[in-house]
Design a protein with these regions (language model features):
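Short Cys/His-rich metal-coordination motifs, predominantly Zn2+-binding knuckles/fingers
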Residues: 212, 229, 365, 466-468, ...
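Amphipathic alpha-helical
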Residues: 251-278, 314, 318-351, 478-481, ...
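Low-acidity, Ser/Thr- and Arg-rich intrinsically disordered low-complexity segments
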Residues: 3-8, 16-19, 24-28, 32-33
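Helix-rich, typically C-terminal accessory recognition domains appended to large enzymatic cores
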Residues: 195-207, 299, 304, 439-468, ...
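N-terminal, positively charged nucleic-acid-binding surface of large information/translation enzymes
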Residues: 39-319, 372, 390, 402, ...
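Basic, alpha-helical terminal appendages of large translation-related enzymes
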Residues: 34-82, 314, 386, 402-413, ...
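Active-site-adjacent bridging/hinge elements
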Residues: 81-89, 162-166, 367-371, 375-377, ...
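Structured ligand/cofactor/substrate-binding pocket environments in proteins
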Residues: 101-113, 130, 177, 184-185, ...
Length: 812
């Protein structure tokens, strides 16, 4: 080795030990002559061929092959020892590609799953593809192929992407919701809830395109026109299937206090549940018309009753049906419903408004209050009746203007709370003019439709018979099979055109009948299909009764933690509803509080330049390209490092480069120390690289003190990282891993700067600290971490200990 190259290598050694810029190392007083001599000798010993460079693709390929060979992430048998944790990730739509939001979500869940396994806990970490629904149908229409072929191809591609990223899912338990063996559970759930009165048939508004002869989802209506033919869309009334969640809304609200007290639900998740609930506290009071017809009304403004100008009633209020017996009023109500009862985009100025002609006595003795029916009530208070107080509510002000003309002072768009004038403070239990008031709560959350007029979805197990009416199938007749060769075109419903599907025999009387051709919304599938993940793959084809009796459900439920995007609030709320219903019905009676998830983390989305990623804006980040350039470990580490899960991640290439640089530094530094011959490293050299006399050794107490300090640094780091992982604070955990690496390098710098050599005990402590570093790195960058542990083993042994360190230095 030439003198010039040796000096260059020495500077690189200094840089690997210190975080200071290389230029400053030449003049730093921190580095003594002995330290420089050590580095010259060190560079001489490790330079040349044989020291492995960081090749993420080779490392990741090797580790993933090893994981597959030993089935590293298979779900343990429930009889095995150890605490059990079902970590539930979100179910991806079979959209064709994994996006960076998926990478963030699954990196969080995977880090936690690996951490739990390392601590000796039994982990179930698996998911199913959400392969039914509109996205798959639209993809099939574009490709002019059956949706079954589209979703199969998408699932295969997405699985390969996820496997390249090294996520530790139990792939044997992966499934697609469009598989008959799985969607029979959705049909079972439908029948179970139908028998309990929690599923019912009603009438609702849908968007309809006369040209395409099909119903449209909200996203398919663009400025009132059909997305496909660009002709006008109109709202029609048709029968729909509804899920009655109203029975459990109050319990879902009440249980939130317990979930918050547990400390395992983050504030994002709790806030989403409160938002879905839409709870409003106030009072209710009983009013009546001049002829004694009663109506209970609600208001959140107990201190402004004398300002009431009218009463607004939801079209879904039960009393509206009574009023509909009046022929003229019934016609007006029908016009209201056909005019867009469930169009949330409509404003109060254009929302339908029907004057019932009824007048209620004012609670404060003022002018009688006209009663109007308007869907503006539903979006604020649910299907109820409310006092209209224009001076307190902007929507009420708009309705009052439509009823009575412009007021002298109208609340402007910027007014959050119109000025209070001449109000009398009224307690929630005080009578008003002899009319008693009661504390009351209203919720925006209410029953919703679960059926869709589309072909690619779970068939509804219902037939229609002229003699028997609506007939539910028996559970023994499940599953009702969806034809796999359906090819939707965007016009009509191909399922309704299949005679082999539609024409059946009535299971009740044996006569002719027709099947229901609506299908279940994929949202309904999601309410239950996370539970069959608990069922061993070998048991999936057993009868439903057999599966429900398995101990596996009791062993894995409730899920210890769910990790999902912040837009999953409705899914989680409705899953909480379903588990409470099945607790009461019987199949999940062992969930005493009815809660499906002991803990919940909602992470925010990944954005770029402050905007949501989209192909239209050209700011999409392709995970495949990133993995090809930097490797999976770098991308996983970057999405965890860049921001707390509860904050939006503003994508930056600099974060990726920083994490890649960190992993390369850890690799190069560790490999060099593992490969260093202790005898060569302990031999001091002078500035010319020639042997030199070593300076006197430090006293044994001082040497022990430095090693003890290193051990304390490791213990502190492990404690902090453990706490971070338990709280799913991945951002903080990664930073603490990085700090530990800095501490390890600082240890070597301090010892060598003062003594010029590493004695055997010092080197052993350094190697042990690097093993600890590798083990705490496993949850975040598992491939490189395991490979480092293998490199640290003497004689090339490949058996490594990946258990979670207790904080002590790991000597073997």
């Amino acid at each position: 080795m030439g003198r010039r190259s040796l000096v260059r290598d020495t500077i690189q050694v200094l840089a690997s030990i210190s975080t200071a810029p290389v230029a400053s190392l030449r003049s730093s007083l921190l580095y003594s002559r002995n330290f420089q001599s050590y580095c010259l000798g060190y560079a001489r010993s490790v330079s040349g061929p044989g020291l492995p460079s960081y090749d993420p693709h080779a490392i990741e390929s090797a580790r993933q092959a090893a994981w597959r060979e030993r089935d590293a992430f298979g779900t343990p048998e429930i009889g095995e020892d150890g605490a059990r944790k079902y970590i539930k990730p979100s179910a991806p739509f079979t959209s064709g590609n994994i996006h960076i939001g998926h990478v963030r979500s699954y990196s969080i869940g995977d880090a936690y799953a690996r951490f739990c396994r390392a601590r000796g806990e039994q982990v179930l970490f698996a998911f199913g593809f959400d392969s039914f629904g509109l996205p798959a149908e639209l993809g099939a229409i574009a490709g002019k192929e059956p949706p079954s072929a589209w979703v199969e191809r998408c699932a295969q591609h997405m699985t390969a992407q996820l496997q390249r990223l090294g996520f530790s899912f139990d792939w044997e338990r992966t499934f697609m919701s469009s598989e008959a063996i799985m969607y029979r559970w959705s049909q079972w759930l439908f029948l179970t809830l139908l028998e309990a009165g929690l599923v019912y048939r009603g009438t609702g508004s849908v968007d309809w395109c006369d040209t395409c002869q099909t119903t449209l989802a909200t996203i398919q209506v663009e400025d009132g026109l059909c997305w496909r033919c660009h002709n006008p869309v109109r709202l029609i009334q048709r029968p729909q299937w509804y899920l009655r969640i109203s029975k459990y809304v109050a319990e879902n609200d009440r249980r939130l206090e317990e979930l918050q007290a547990s400390g395992m639900w983050d504030e994002n998740a709790l806030a989403s549940q409160r938002f879905v609930l839409g709870r409003v506290d106030g009072i209710e009071l009983d009013l009546s018309t001049a002829d004694g017809e009663p109506l209970t009304v609600f208001t959140p403004h107990a201190d402004a009753l004398e300002l009431a100008r009218f009463v607004a009633v939801s079209p879904r209020h039960p009393q509206v049906e009574e009023w509909a017996r009046d022929e003229l009023l019934a016609q007006r109500l029908e016009e209201l419903r056909s005019g867009g009862l469930e169009r949330s985009a409509r404003e109060a100025q254009t929302m339908p408004l029907v004057d019932t002609g009824r007048l209620l006595a004012s609670p404060t003795g003022g002018e009688p209050l006209p009663v109007v029916v308007t869907p503006t009530v539903d979006g604020r208070f649910g299907p109820t009746a409310v006092l209209g107080i224009p001076e307190r509510d902007r929507t009420d002000a708009v309705i009052a203007e439509r009823l009575f003309g412009p007021p002298v002072d109208t609340p402007t768009a910027g007014d959050e709370a119109p000025a209070k004038t001449h109000t009398t403070r009224t307690g929630v239990s005080d009578p008003v003019n002899g009319v008693p008031t009661r504390e009351a709560v209203r919720y925006r959350a209410n029953d919703f439709t679960i059926s869709r007029q589309r072909s690619w979805g779970t068939p509804i197990p219902i037939v229609y018979c002229e003699r028997c009416g609506t007939v539910a199938l028996a559970r023994e007749q499940l599953p009702v099979i969806l034809p796999l060769d359906l090819t939707p075109t965007g016009t009509g419903n191909p399922l309704a055109e299949r005679e082999d599907f539609v024409r059946v025999t009535c299971p009740s009387c044996g006569g002719s009948a027709t099947r229901e051709t609506d299908t279940l919304d994929c949202h309904f599938d999601a309410l239950w299909l996370w539970i069959p993940v608990c069922v061993p793959p070998g048991e999936r084809e057993q009868s439903l009764e057999h599966i429900l009796a398995l101990e596996d459900l009791r062993a894995w439920l409730p899920s210890e933690r769910v990790v999902a995007g912040s837009d999953s609030g409705n899914f989680v709320f409705d899953q909480r509803t379903i588990t409470k219903a099945l607790r009461d019905i019987g199949p999940l009676e062992f969930l005493k509080d009815g809660e499906p998830f002991a803990g919940c983390l909602f992470h925010e989305m990944v954005i770029r330049d402050g905007r949501k990623m989209s192909k239209h804006l050209g700011n999409v980040v392709d995970p495949d390209e990133l993995v090809a350039q930097y490797g999976a470990d770098t991308i996983r580490l970057a999405v965890l490092f860049a921001a707390r899960a509860q904050r939006s991640l503003n994508w930056s290439d600099s974060d990726v480069k920083r994490c890649h640089r960190f992993l390369r530094q850890v690799w190069d530094y560790s490999q060099a120390r593992f490969a260093l011959d202790p005898a060569s490293a302990a031999e001091p050299h002078d500035a010319n690289g020639s042997p030199a006399e070593a300076e006197p050794r430090m006293g044994p107490d001082k040497t022990e003190h430095l090693r003890n300090r290193l051990e304390q640094w490791c213990e502190t780091a492990v404690e902090k990282i453990t706490e971070d992982l338990q709280e799913l604070e991945m951002h903080s955990a990664v930073r603490n891993v990085m700090r530990l690496f800095d501490r390890i390098r600082d240890y070597e710098k301090r010892v060598i700067a003062k003594r010029g050599v590493l004695c055997a005990e010092d080197r052993e402590a350094l190697i042990a600290a690097l093993r600890t570093l590798a083990r705490v790195l496993i949850p975040f960058a598992p491939h490189i971490a395991e490979e480092l542990l293998i490199s640290s083993m003497p004689d090339g042994r490949s058996e490594i200990d990946t258990s979670w360190p207790a904080g002590e230095l790991v000597s073997r």
